[in-house]
C-alpha cells in the first residue's frame, strides 16, 4: 500500500520560512526606512500621527517686556495598511519531475514579488516630495550634488545615500571627486554602494527614471529615517490543494504600508520632463484659496511646495475651468505669487490657476482651484 509522506506534500510552514527568509532582500530602500510595529497585534489598520510646525525663532525681549506666547500647531497625518499579495500554481508533474526546485524557486519569487511592490511604494513616497526639496539641474555631477546638499541647510552632515540610474553613475565615475568603493569606509548604510561623492553613498537603481505622473526624473539624496514602514502582519502563506487538477496553489501576502516620515531628510535632484497637472491632488497637497476682505481672496501655496531656485509660482483668476499652460511655451498673463497673506481682487472670478514657471515663464506644474472671496 502506498503511504503519503511529507516528501509528497508542500508544507506551508516550510514555504513560509523560505519566503520570510528572503523577504526584504529585494527592497532597495529598506535600510533607509525605520520599521514601525505600532499596529502589530493591535486592532485597526490606520495609524495617525501629528506633524508639528516650527514655532519660529526666539525674539529679543527687553527688561520687563512681555513675552508673547507662540502657538504650537500640528496637523494629523494618517496612513492605512496595504495588503500586498501574489500567488503561484505548481502542478504535481512540475513538483515531482526532479528538475530544479519549483517549490523553493516559487517561494523566492513570491518574496521578490512582495518586495518589488513595497519597494515601488517606497520610491513613490520619495517621488511625492514637495518642490521645496528639489534642486533643479539638467545633468548629474559632483558639483550638482554639492549644490543640492545646500537644501539640507545647517544639517548636511551624517550618513546619506544618493540614488541614481546607470547613466548617472557613469557620469560620476568620470568626476575627479568620485571616491571608489575600495576607498570608502566600512560603516555603510547600503551594502551595494558603488562609490561616494561628498559624503553620499552612491547606489544604482532602475527606479530612477522618467515619471509619467509627475513629469519628472528625480535622483534622490536620502538620510536614514526619512521613510517609515508600518507593519501589520508579516508574510502569510496559505496552500490550496486542487485535487481535480492535481496541483497546489501557493498564496502569499504581506500587510504593511510605507510613508514619507521626515521630508527634511530628502533632497531630489530634479529634471522636469513635461507639464504635470496637479488639480486632482490640489486639496491633498494644500493648494487652495481662502476668503479675504470683501471681494478679495488669498492664494495659498503650501510651504512644502515653495518654488525651488530659478522658479516661481504665478497665478491667474478667471471664470474658465480648463487647465492653463503648455510645456515648452512661455505662459503669458500670470501674476507673481506674492505670498500666502497677500490679498487678491477676486470679484466675479470662479477659478484660480496656479503655475510653477522657470525664468523663461515656461510652466512645469499647473493646477486649478476654486476661488473663495470675502463677502
Identify what each model region corresponds to.
Residues 1-32, 214-216, 220-225, 229-276:
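Protruding loop/beta-arch "assembly-hinge" segments enriched in small, turn-prone residues
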Residues 90-157, 267-276:
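Alpha-helical scaffold segments that mediate packing/assembly in large oligomeric complexes
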Residues 300-310:
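Acidic, Ser/Thr
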Residues 346-367:
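Beta-strand-rich modules
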Residues 311-315:
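Short beta-strand elements bearing conserved aromatic residues within extracellular beta-rich modules
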Residues 43, 48, 143, 149-236:
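Extended oligomerization regions of viral-like shell subunits
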Residues 1-74:
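N-terminal "assembly arms/tails" that initiate or stabilize quaternary assembly
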Residues 336-350:
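Surface-exposed, short loops/turns at beta-strand junctions within beta-sandwich domains
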Amino acid at each position: 500500500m502506498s503511504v503519503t509522506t511529507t516528501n509528497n506534500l508542500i508544507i506551508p510552514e516550510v514555504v513560509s520560512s523560505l519566503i520570510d527568509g528572503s523577504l526584504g532582500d529585494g527592497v532597495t530602500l529598506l535600510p533607509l526606512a525605520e520599521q514601525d510595529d505600532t499596529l502589530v497585534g493591535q486592532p485597526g489598520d490606520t495609524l495617525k500621527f501629528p506633524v508639528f510646525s516650527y514655532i519660529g525663532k526666539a525674539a529679543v525681549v527687553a527688561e520687563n517686556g512681555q513675552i508673547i506666547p507662540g502657538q504650537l500647531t500640528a496637523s494629523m497625518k494618517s496612513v492605512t495598511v496595504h495588503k500586498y499579495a501574489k500567488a503561484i500554481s505548481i502542478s504535481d508533474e512540475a513538483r515531482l519531475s526532479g528538475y530544479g526546485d519549483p517549490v523553493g524557486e516559487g517561494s523566492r519569487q513570491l518574496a521578490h514579488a512582495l518586495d518589488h511592490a513595497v519597494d515601488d511604494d517606497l520610491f513613490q513616497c520619495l517621488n511625492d516630495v514637495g518642490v521645496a526639496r528639489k534642486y533643479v539641474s539638467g545633468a548629474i555631477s559632483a558639483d550638482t550634488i554639492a549644490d543640492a546638499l545646500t537644501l539640507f541647510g545647517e544639517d548636511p552632515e551624517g550618513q546619506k545615500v544618493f540614488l541614481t540610474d546607470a547613466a548617472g553613475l557613469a557620469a560620476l565615475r568620470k568626476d575627479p571627486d568620485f571616491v571608489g568603493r575600495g576607498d570608502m569606509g566600512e560603516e555603510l548604510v547600503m551594502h551595494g554602494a558603488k562609490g561616494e561623492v561628498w559624503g553620499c553613498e552612491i547606489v544604482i537603481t532602475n527606479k530612477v527614471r522618467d515619471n509619467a505622473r509627475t513629469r519628472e526624473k528625480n535622483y534622490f539624496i536620502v538620510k536614514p529615517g526619512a521613510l517609515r514602514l508600518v507593519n501589520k502582519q508579516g508574510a502569510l502563506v496559505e496552500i490550496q490543494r486542487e485535487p481535480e487538477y492535481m496541483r497546489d496553489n501557493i498564496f502569499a501576502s504581506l500587510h504593511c504600508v510605507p510613508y514619507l516620515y521626515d521630508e527634511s531628510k530628502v533632497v531630489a535632484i530634479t529634471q522636469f520632463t513635461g507639464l504635470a497637472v496637479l488639480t486632482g491632488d490640489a486639496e491633498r497637497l494644500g493648494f487652495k484659496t481662502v476668503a479675504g476682505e470683501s471681494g478679495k481672496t488669498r492664494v495659498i501655496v503650501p510651504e512644502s511646495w515653495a518654488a525651488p531656485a530659478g522658479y516661481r509660482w504665478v497665478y491667474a483668476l478667471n471664470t474658465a475651468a480648463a487647465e492653463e499652460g503648455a510645456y515648452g511655451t512661455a505662459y503669458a498673463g500670470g501674476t507673481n505669487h506674492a505670498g500666502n497673506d497677500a490679498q487678491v481682487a477676486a470679484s466675479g472670478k470662479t477659478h484660480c490657476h496656479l503655475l510653477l514657471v522657470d525664468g523663461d515663464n515656461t510652466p512645469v506644474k499647473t493646477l486649478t482651484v476654486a476661488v473663495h472671496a470675502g463677502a
